[in-house]
A protein has these predicted regions:
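DnaQ-like (DEDDh/DEDDy) 3′-5′ exonuclease domain used for proofreading
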Residues: 1-25, 152, 156-194
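Conserved non-catalytic scaffold segment of RNase H-like nuclease domains
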Residues: 1-112, 126-148
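A positively charged, amphipathic N-terminal helix/segment that binds anionic biomolecules
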Residues: 165-242
Length: 242
């Protein structure tokens, strides 16, 4: 699978779920190329207090970040590390949204090919209902030294990828990956085949949330185009699937 010879498995920890309001506090990368495996990690100073919930989740304290670099200090090094690689992350919309915003603030446009391993897991194992990282650890017997630390979680995503490579036929898997990468902006739980069936005609559409409660009703002269437009931008997303 030549197209997938250069991969960057990425995880971030943040002060919250909004890529516009919150800040990155830790980044971990496992870069896999034909030259081998390279790991990269950095804490970041968010210049704001870490919420207690985040401190308890990650174990990262405010005092640890006081002397950490700003994102601007590591941006060029990180950008160079990620350039030319497929960006692989668990619930990739979350990590990508934060990183695109952070790079944009320092004048860099970050627009990689993206592979979400939540969507990959759903595609490869549709018989399971849960595809968060803890479920993958249990299901695939992944080894972990800790959870909710950036480099440790990036290593877990890499481990899952290694399991996938040994479990599935290479030619078939390559087609699956190409399809997923071509539609990276869709939410991890949304079936692309369902979206593909939408007509390009006038009509009304309805989004449902949990417990089948309606969230949004819209209308358009082109249903498919309009529904897809809801997912074309970078969205805030919680770490529910991580």
């Amino acid at each position: 699978m030549k197209r997938f010879d250069s991969l960057a498995f990425v995880d971030i920890e943040t002060t919250g779920s909004s890529c516009n309001r919150d800040q990155i506090i830790e980044i971990g990368v496992v870069r896999v190329t034909e030259m081998g495996i390279q790991e990269w990690h950095s804490l970041l100073n968010p210049h704001m207090q870490i919420p207690l919930m985040i401190k308890q989740l990650t174990g990262i304290s405010n005092s640890q970040l006081e002397q950490a670099p700003d994102f601007a200090d590591i941006a060029k090094e990180l950008f160079s590390l990620l350039t030319g690689c497929v960006f692989v992350a668990h619930n990739a919309r979350f990590d990508l949204g934060f990183l695109k915003n952070a790079f944009k603030r320092v004048g860099l446009e970050f627009a990689p090919s993206v592979l979400c391993t939540v969507r990959l897991s759903r595609t490869l194992h549709p018989q399971y209902s849960r595809h968060n990282l803890d479920s993958l650890i249990e299901r695939h017997r992944l080894s972990t030294e800790s959870r909710h630390r950036a480099l440790a979680d990036a290593r877990l995503v890499h481990q899952f990828w290694q399991r996938v490579l040994t479990e599935f036929d290479e030619e078939w898997l390559s087609q699956v990956l190409i399809k997923l990468i071509q539609h990276p902006s869709l939410p991890s739980h949304l079936d692309f085949d369902l979206v593909k069936q939408l007509p390009q005609t006038p009509g009304v559409y309805l989004f449902y949330g949990e417990n089948d409660l309606p969230l949004y009703i819209g209308k358009s002269i082109n249903l498919k185009q309009r529904v897809m437009s809801h997912f074309s931008a970078d969205h805030r997303q919680s770490k529910e699937m991580r």
